[in-house]
Amino acid sequence: MTEFVTSADGTRIAYDVEGSGPPVILVGGAMQFRAFDPITSEMAQHLAGHGFAVVNYDRRGRGESPADAPITLAQTIDDLRALTDELTEGADDAVALFGNSSGASIALAAAAAGLPVSRLVFFEAPLDEEGGEDGAVFLAELRERIAAGDRVGTLEAYMSDMPPEWLEGAKQSPGWSTMLEIAPSLEPDAESLAWTQSGPRAELWRDISTHGGPPVEDLARSAWPVAQNGTATG
């Protein structure tokens, strides 16, 4: 059942909770929200079955969490703080954050901003170099497209460093209209990715253990020589 929490600026954030136990918040990436991403909902149910209270939420500007542009990383972190307060009943207890794709950089930024986080878990975190010095060019171009109301251009700018066939496939897919609708909500994704390029990497990555291949493995090793790497089966 959908519940709502009110963020610092009054925006209502829609979410579901599955199970009970230590709290885990699932932070979606670029195109993810509950009605558009059944796989994350399935994962929430799976984790709940292993003794966790799992929050799957619609990020600001998506699904049942409507908001006007511009949508900032700071606002997105405020939304996570509101969810955390709701889960812990204001006790400031720590929560685990699972970040998928660019949701990983948002989760990392939230932890760096002081959100009480017990664990950070990333899946396919795109934390390699973004275009332009410190990601600034990438972010500036996206913001320019959003400010102009150019939703097609926003998606094209965001996907500019991805294989061209991914963008063409998206344009031909039934979900393209939904992607256009939520395009302004990509700004926090871009802002957080740019932030990872300008932050103190050794501090950000020193406690990271990676499971799988690049880019996270390479980035962690370059930032902190004792970073661990492992591969999980299944």
State where each predicted segment sits.
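Conserved serine/cysteine hydrolase catalytic core
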Residues: 175-221, 227-228, 232-234
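Alpha-helical elements of Rossmann-like donor-binding domains used by nucleotide-donor carbohydrate transfer enzymes
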Residues: 42, 75-82, 141, 153, ...
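Active-site loop/oxyanion-hole signature of alpha/beta-hydrolase fold enzymes
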Residues: 45-49, 56-95
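Conserved hydrolase catalytic core segment
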Residues: 92-131
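Conserved HGGG/HGGXW glycine-rich cap/lid loop of the alpha/beta-hydrolase fold
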Residues: 4-66
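Short hydrophobic segments within beta-strands
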Residues: 26-30, 98, 212
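Short amphipathic alpha-helical segments and helix-helix/interface helices
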Residues: 41-45, 84, 143, 183, ...
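Helix-rich cap/lid subdomain of alpha/beta-hydrolase
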Residues: 125-177, 187-194, 204
